[in-house]
């Protein structure tokens, strides 16, 4: 009887280890789902931010172009002046204006490029999150089923069905 009890206890311990492993697997998939949800929300946030940054960069670019054309027109008129000093000064100012315009446009284009990259990264994060959520969801279903089966087996081992003992008493 003692050997049978020891064997039963070791079987229960093994089954408890199986239950613990199944629970760890469930926890792993739940953590993956949390990561997936986080990726999706961060990706959506990045996309939203990038849209406003793109709009801002495009508006700045339009404003820079408009100001440049206005200033250029005035300076070109002065450069065509008969007064040589005024014309030389206007030409120098025009050169300076062109250089400033190139720098400002380059900066606006860089902001636009960064916003576009941020949008692409956000889209990648959303896709990655959706894929991870799908695989983790499927894995979680299987892991929960395994956990329930292992727990049921453990419960049965700890509390054997009472029908067998009651049928022996009737005989």
Mark where each language-model region is.
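Extended amphipathic alpha-helical heptad-repeat regions
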Residues: 4-171
């Amino acid at each position: 009887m003692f050997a049978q009890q020891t064997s039963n206890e070791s079987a229960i311990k093994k089954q408890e280890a199986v239950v613990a492993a199944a629970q760890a697997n469930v926890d792993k998939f739940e953590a993956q789902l949390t990561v997936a949800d986080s990726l999706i929300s961060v990706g959506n946030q990045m996309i939203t931010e990038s849209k406003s940054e793109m709009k801002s960069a495009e508006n700045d670019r339009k404003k820079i172009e408009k100001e440049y054309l206005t200033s250029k027109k005035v300076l070109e008129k002065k450069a065509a002046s008969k007064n040589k000093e005024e014309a030389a000064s206007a030409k120098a100012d025009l050169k300076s204006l062109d250089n400033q315009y190139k720098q400002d446009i380059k900066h606006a284009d860089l902001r636009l490029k960064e916003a576009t990259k941020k949008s692409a990264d956000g889209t990648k994060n959303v896709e990655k999150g959706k894929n991870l959520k799908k695989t983790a969801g499927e894995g979680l279903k299987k892991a929960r089923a395994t956990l329930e089966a292992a727990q049921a087996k453990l419960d049965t081992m700890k509390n054997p069905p009472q029908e067998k003992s009651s049928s022996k008493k009737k005989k």
